[in-house]
Amino acid sequence: MYLNDTLKNKARKPQLELQPRQKCWTRLPLRRLFATNIGYTSANNAPHNCRAHWKPWGVAFVVAAFCALPHAVMGQDEPENKGLTLRGSIQTDMLVPENDKQTGATKANGDFLNNTYVELGASLKNIDVGLRLEYLQYPLPGFEPDFKGWGVPHYYIKWQTKRMELTAGTFYEQFGSGFVLRTYEERSLGIDNSLLGGRLKVNPLPGVFVKALAGKQRRYWEHNDDWVAGGDLELNIEQWLPGMQEHDHYLMLGASVVNKNEPDEVIMTDASHRLRLPRNVMAYDVRARWQHGAYNVLAEYAQKGQDPTADNGYIYRHGYVAMLSGSYSKQGLSLLLQAKRSVNMGFRSRRSMMGTSSSINHLPAFTLEHTYALPAMRPYATQPLGEWAYQASLGYKLKKGTALGGRYGTALKLNFSHVHGIDQNVHGTKGTDGYGSAFWAWGDATYYQDLNLQMEKQWSHALKTTLMYMNQRYNKTVVEGEGGMIHANIFVADVKWKMSPRTTLRTEAQYLQSKDDDGDWLFGLLELSLAPSWMFTVSDQYNSGSTRTHYYQALVTFSHGAHRLQVGYGRTKDGYNCSGGVCRYIPATKGATLSYSYNF
């Protein structure tokens, strides 16, 4: 979620709705196929308005498509089953929680927690069908009670030719950089904002790509009643001008439009006045990408109409985002420069929702996503109400055989990111346009800043080291709701030793120095890999500042073919799991874990 939406009161667990909804005691609805419910809801001890019922037409839709595939093959003048492809996957993550007074971990949600996903798909010639079963009857910590349930929320049938693709059912889509539309699944964050409806993709001419779609957006185990519709056009100009390709020039022009249709509702400004809410909110996006040799430049601008929502305090200010990104890359050298300004660009299919629920678009964070534990401890969450964001990244590889490069060469990476608030001239509240903001004007607050330098050096065939330094400024008040500015210096050393062709030992040592928040942190990790199947990992994250708490973990991982099994035991610190500037708060845990995945 965008953290400041729901975390201003940390004692309260994140809730994604402003008003509570009455729930069935046991709620396991699957989902509608268009206007038809599919699934089962238990009536035991349920409120009088919750009824047990089966309406399996949606499941029958996909099952029939699966069953029809072999018969379709038999009807061809080809050997039976030629061209039929079946695929699937299973992923399950389990936790047996324990109470832990020192970390605050509890087993309040049950003695056994589990998130399980099973996907099945089949394709024959130009027909593709698929479905996904999800079981979250006892969801993992950090997932709201609305996730509780099981069902088949994802199912589709797709028909594809050389120039056209037609999808009916649920689907994911992105227009451009996602400023006006991005639907996607991110299981670790509990995000699945897919659309249930139809989508058409057409490539009528070389270099011309058209998309059109309409649907209702998923919200937990339901779909909002509001409609989302849109279209996208991309033109690859070099396809029409052969001279451009001959001189290694490529130009893409794109445009998108998205509309959300939402009925009126009662939102009061005071005891006697209510808001007049727009039924349709339009958003537009235009973009251009130019490539030549090692150079790549992208410019994109999106704008949204008046859209009073719970996110922005029900103001009527137009929203927009402008982005400019340039990169250069050749052997041994890479450079990235980016800048982005966004104002009031949260976009949801349901205006009263907050957190991650019902988001139509996506605003990427111009900050580096770290993989080491301490640098990743305080990630940045994009602020949809407005921000200026900048990022610069430089990569350089010192040549082999030089004094600094050594025998195998040395890779250097320098990254700097800075996110700042926008200037706001506030002149109104709910029911007005809220504030004015000059385009180039900064606000008073720095939201986030990260300067990091990383060096990777291969000393020999068996030994490799990675060293990293990071200076971080993290505005906890802006991102989480309280806490002030946190300054930290972080040091990382990673040593990888290939002891034999099948045995590798990797160690990590990390130190975070800070006079703010919880003070200093230490982290250590030892990882032994026995190829091709086994990996043993032990780690400890220790707060040497105010809490003096150890967060230890032990993991054993076994891989064989498409199977992967991991079992473990330990503690995890409360914090934020983020991806692309979208975050979810995860409470502290202690207990045994098991994860299994399989693909076929």
Label for each model-derived stretch:
Residues N9, K13, K23-C24:
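Polybasic, lysine-rich low-complexity intrinsically disordered segments
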Residues L140, E144-F147, Y220-H223, K304-R317:
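Outer-membrane beta-barrel proteins
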Residues G58-P70:
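Bacterial N-terminal signal peptides
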Residues W25, W54-W57:
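Tryptophan (W) side chains
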Residues V59, M74-E173, F179-V180, L195-A214, ...:
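Beta-barrel outer-membrane channel/assembly domains of diderm bacteria
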Residues Q91, T106, L113, M244-D248, ...:
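Exposed, low-structure sequence patches enriched in small/polar residues
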